[in-house]
Amino acid sequence: MRRIDSAPTRDTLVKLLHNDALGRNGDLAEFAGILKSIEGGFSLFVDADWGSGKTFFVRQVACILEEVNPFLESHGDLDGLLGNNCELAPYTELNSFLPVYYNAWENDHWDDPLPSIAASIALQGDACASFRSDTEAGEKIAGTLDAILGVFGHGGASSLRDAFSGRDLIQAYRDRETLRSSVSNLVDVALPEKANTLLLIVDELDRCRPSFAMKVLEQLKNLFADDRVVIVYSVNANQLSHVVEGTYGQGFDGRRYLSRFYDLTIPLR
């Protein structure tokens, strides 16, 4: 394996699949087997050091899944994508996933991650092909985003931060239930006639502000507990554990804390 410094464009991802310059095709094949075995909601860590190709790995997974799903607009030249690589043939059976990529680091300037995560699901790739305000799906998506933004916005509904500080615990509970319902509605709109399972890929979490990283983990665990959602965190788990320990203080077991948020860890070589 060697480091690749170019951007993970589709052309670069395809080229790397063909020449296996990162030595990851074997890992990709194993990952396909894991996805095939998952039943119901699931979360996993793809764990590797910085600069080892995690982003390329998860972007390749997303690229392949988009290509093999016949109901996505990006579906097309599967042979051109996989070439003669029989090792990756198991992906042809994974044709019911809707992959959504979310770069946490690029969004950590926000106070709360959920609105940007919801927007990524609603607007990214083929999931937003019908996102127009004059369509029924567009109206549903817009209404769902409005509900989510209402909880985190100014005025109107209380912010969760203020509510949980003791100002209005009843409103806090109502806001949380609103978010749960809104997230479920968002998945309802994104998946029908396109896929059975949403694969949410969360990348660069270990590079985020500590408070933002913690909110991503907590909100996804609490709000995306859905049998139709699989969450993949692409992380340097060792670095992320230090982030956790720095947040909670000396002597706190960051690794043990992180274990609350995944069902399986996949170490990349």
Which positions does each model-derived feature cover?
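Short hydrophobic/aromatic beta-strand immediately N-terminal to the Walker A/P-loop
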Residues: 43-47, 101, 200
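Conserved strand-to-helix beginnings and helix N-cap segments that scaffold or border functional pockets
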Residues: 111-115, 210-217
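Switch/connector loops and helix/strand junctions flanking conserved nucleotide-binding motifs
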Residues: 54, 109-113, 239-245
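Walker B catalytic acidic pair
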Residues: 203-204
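P-loop NTPase nucleotide-binding core
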Residues: 58, 63-189
